[in-house]
Structures are given as C-alpha cells and as structure tokens.
Amino acid sequence: MASSSNYDGILLGMGNPLLDISAVVDDEFLTKYDIKLNNAILAEDKHLPMYDEMSSKFNVEYIAGGATQNSIKVAQWMLQIPGATSYMGSIGKDKYGEAMKKDATAAGVNVHYYEDESAPTGTCGVCVVGGERSLIANLSAANCYKVDHLKKPENWALVEKAKFYYIAGFFLTVSPESIQLVSEHAAANNKVFTMNLSAPFICEFFKDVQEKFLPYMDFVFGNETEARTFSRVHGWETEDVEQIAIKISQLPKATGTYKRTTVITQGADPVVVAEDGKVKKYPVIPLPKEKLVDTNGAGDAFVGGFMSQLVKEKSIEECVKAGCYASNVVIQRSGCTYPEKPDFN
C-alpha cells in the first residue's frame, strides 16, 4: 500500500449539500404531492408544505445528504485514509448547515463550504414507500454556490491537489461556470473527470449544459431510467441499456488521454459497463427483500465505492465490486449511512 500522503486530497467532489428529511410515507401522500417513486425532482411551490407535513405526520429522520456529498463520504469511508477526499458546495448559516459541517468533518471529508448569508441550508424530502425512494429537493442555499468561491486560492488549491473529480449532474443547475473550470483543469492536466446523469429531469431539461460537459467526462455514471431518458432526448430510439451505454461512451471527447467509460446501475439487475465499444455486465450482491430498508443513497454509494478503488488505480472489475459492496451496505440502512468500518477486500 502506498503511503497515505500520496492520497492527500486525491478525490474532489462538488455539489449540492442537502439535509435529507426522510420518512416512510404512504401512497396517499405520494398522490397528494404528485410524487413518483424512484424519481428525483426539484421542489415546486406545491411541494413546499410537504416538509412540515412529513414531520408532523410521519416518523422523520434528518440525515446529511446531497448526491455528491454522499458519494464523497462513502469513498472516504471505503478508503479509511484521513484527508483523501475534499468537497465544496453551499450551505446556509443555520443549525442545519452546522450539523452538515459536523457530519461531513466527522466522516473525514475536508469540506470547504460556501456559507450563504441569506438562504437557509437546502433540504431534500425523501419519501419512502416499500423500500423505494423519491427525492424532492429544495435547494435554497445550495443553489447559491458561486464560482468566486472556487477561485479563492485556498479552494482552488483543492482542485490543484486532486487527481480525480466527481460532480453529480444536479450541480449543472447551480454552477456550470464552476464545472467548466474544473473540467478544463482536469483535461489540461491529464486528470480524471467524472459526472453522473443524476436524474431524468437533468437529461431532459438541462440537456444543453449537460452536453457541453460530456466531452470532458472520462466516466459517466447513471441508472437505467436516466440512461433511457438520455437516449430518448438524443433521439436514439433505443431502450436497450447496453446499447445506450456504448453510445454514451462513444460520444466525442475533449482529450484523447482517456477513453470514456459509461457505468449504468440497474437496481437489482447487473451493472452495465461500456468502454471501447464493448459491454461487460457485473452482477450485484443479492439482498433478500426483508433486509432492504430503503434505496436512498444507493446510487451515490455505488459511485463512492467505485471511486475509492479508481483513485487506487484498480481494475474496472474491482471498482464495480467496491461500488456494489457499498450500495449493498447502504440499502440495509436508512439514508446514505454506513457502519464504522468497511468490510471490503
């Protein structure tokens, strides 16, 4: 094993830090707020009363979340090397923001938050029915991230130090300027830049900005629903996840340093990995239904596990194995949480 100093700040994430407000709800609640399971959306006005209703009607848990932050925390947990990961995003100056800072720091992540004076820390309603989750994000302060924060010397130093970057697609709606700086830096310095399709609405309504950064993506993550939405939006006329994964991996690249690898998870079905015009499928670890708590954070955990081995320059097979291990741990718990130490080798 290389000395831990080689891993100092090796992985940097940027995204929307959100406090998950998670509860097992009922179908009636989903219908009332027009919520579909296995989806992720931004809150509209009609959703705003939902958060209070959740806490008054159901048994609510508050868990530090946000897609990229989840993945970075899981990577940090898998690596067990202090300071291997860093993260930037925007929180409010309030108790939720403080709680988030405490949580991420306790997880061993080097967080450099932008603290917004006017907006409260963002929240994400996590509605669980039958173990499946739906996410309704009220970004608030997370939406206020400014590229000026990234440009500050102490923050840009994190970009310089990192060799791998992960940004969830959700951040495209917040600070494309920041994504541009980081992706161009990665390309110019032969570093590895990775993103996630993240949600159908990103592929559909933020198609142009997503396409702008696709050439920079060395790894593209997503799930089967997002992949099919991506295919439809691009007029590919195929629902076949393997074909879609190949097509995504063959889209133009900004540099020839790395070939693009596309990694699509499909819940309990095998993980599809496309590179070089070929597809490989990797089975996930089966889990009996009664052990499933909820799928919140499953995709994030997969990416975290995957990245934890990628930074060690392990094979794709090892990376997928670690991703499957991490998501298997997380779906047996509420939210994107994990025990003290991983049991992965």
Swiss-Prot record:
Alphabetized UniProt keyword annotations: ATP-binding, Cytoplasm, Host-virus interaction, Kinase, Magnesium, Nucleotide-binding, Phosphoprotein, Purine salvage, Transferase
GO cellular component: cytoplasm; cytosol; plasma membrane
Catalysis performed (reactions): adenosine + ATP = AMP + ADP + H(+)
PTM field: Phosphorylated by KIN11.
Gene Ontology MF terms in the entry: adenosine kinase activity; ATP binding; copper ion binding; kinase binding
Compartments reported by the entry: Cytoplasm
Enzyme Commission number(s) from the entry: 2.7.1.20
Tissues showing expression: Widely expressed.
Activity regulation text: Inactivated by the begomovirus AL2 protein or the curtovirus L2 protein.
Cofactor: Mg(2+)
Chief location: cytoplasm
Pathway listed: Purine metabolism; AMP biosynthesis via salvage pathway; AMP from adenosine: step 1/1
Annotated Pfam families: PfkB
Biological process according to GO: adenosine salvage; AMP salvage
Active-site residue numbers: D300
Quaternary structure (record): Interacts with the begomovirus AL2 protein and the curtovirus L2 protein. Interacts with KIN11.
Family: Belongs to the carbohydrate kinase PfkB family.
Primary role: ATP dependent phosphorylation of adenosine and other related nucleoside analogs to monophosphate derivatives. Essential to sustain methyl recycling.
Listed name of the protein: Adenosine kinase 2
Organism: Arabidopsis thaliana (Mouse-ear cress)
